[in-house]
Amino acid sequence: MTEPLLDSSSDDEPSLVLPENINQPFTTGAEVFGWCLYSWAAEPFIVSVVGTYVPLLLEQIARDNGVKLIDKITPCNQPHDPTIPIPSPPKDGDFPNSTLTYASQNDSCVLPMFGGRFYIDTSSYALYTFSMSVLIQTILVISMSGAADRGSHRKSMLVGFGVTGGLITMCYWLVDDRNYYMASMLAILANSAFGGVNVCGNSFLSLLVNNHPSVRQIHLSKSLKLARMGEISSKISGICAASGYISALLMQIITMLVILHVRNNPNIDSLIYPLKLVIGLVGLWWFVFQLPIQFLLKPRLSKELHVSIEPPDPSKPGYSVNIVRYKMLVVGAYILHGYKTLFSAARAASQLKDIMAFLLGWFIISDSLTTINSTAILFAKSDLQMTTVQLSQIGVLTMISAIAGSVLLPNVIQPYFKLGLKQTMILIIVWASLIPLYGILGFFIRSLGLHHAVEMYVLAIWYGFSLGGVATISRSLYSMLIPPGQESVFFALFSITDKGSSIVGPFLVGLIIDKTHDIRKCFWLLFVFLIAAVPVFWYGIDVDRGINEATVLEHEQDG
């Protein structure tokens, strides 16, 4: 969450108080460098760890501990014990209302959970893990958003979450072939830490812009100041985004080379060792580059949240207990403020039909695009038998294509074809929907439709281009529909929608895999989701109407 670049709230707002030393120092080049460093440090985690290696590790470690679905006794990755009889093939009717053949039953692998109380498909284990991690991350993001936007906590929280996330990711070095619960828990904790870093990092942008020397020196013209702020904001934000992209691409190449080196070592036969090695390296990268932020960024005070209780007197008895109680009350007040901010955003958005339509469409798109990545990675490993090196190469191609999409779509394709933002957004949705549609084609054609590894390379380029394009166009379209002066609260809602949507897709895909033990069937769900977003944008959003409604709402609130 970020504050509005111009704070329109009055200083005598009852729930907020200004600290006495609210005067801010000028933004320096070193501070901008320090802010960009948070993206340089953390972006490889989301691209390499979450996007590539952790899904592979979780699937592999689940398979190493899994058993055959047909008897739930035979280990998946070990030869069958001759003393244990193999069950006879099932007769017709043994699996009523099931789409499974005997062959798919025999090949499928399931993981016993909590002492064998129930079983899940080994491919769905990673999806359930990420669904849970996003749920925890969303709760954390809402709870801490009040502290990230208020007071002097954002710097310490940014560094703290980054260091914690790096250390947790490095703990993958301790995971062995049996620790599938530990591997899953580390993914949940590290992804939650990344969410905290992202919130705190975003909250710095408006402060860096407001206190930039070229902005502070403008006193007479508000319009000129706003224009300069927009220019500086785009410049700083662009540098930060570029540093994250470059860092992620660089780290993806480094980890791929490490895996190549380890694979050629005849003394290493563990399938998860190279995966946990490169995951830990990304954690080390995150940890090392997070530390300089402590010295480069200034605390940047902002309005403190007022707590209607005085701090305890150190001279009175029971001070240690009272100070703990006081700090808990302060933490609770900040958490409550975060949820109040979210409800305020939802209440304001409910008055704007175009904002509501956008958020509904964005919920579907964000969920689908996120789930396509993890589903495709698991499909490539389990069905196409692609190696970790090949999947690393796909990650590199996706990253390069995403950069190209983010540049070419708004700067070349959109102006050349004279497309509006809504039309461009719909074009991207249709473009992305061809990915699961191509996977569905494999049900009917053996020569096409993701039956060969080379097809994954082509789809990686296709997917990356849509990913880079949608990231650029979505924010531009959404920003046009927001009432001026309420950017912070509405982008908070955008962020929560973005994060929260990623709970649904992986969970539903995991259920489909558990029911059918066929990842390809998940492409039907992803295709339907993406196509469902088209009418939401086509019929639900009128950009001119949205701008007018936002302006009217702004005037009503000012009045």
Swiss-Prot record:
Example of a GO biological process term: amino acid transmembrane export from vacuole
Signal peptide start-end: none
Gene3D superfamilies reported for this sequence: MFS general substrate transporter like domains
Superkingdom as given in the UniProt entry: Eukaryota
Record membrane topology: Multi-pass membrane protein
Family: Belongs to the ATG22 family.
Protein name per UniProt: Autophagy-related protein 22
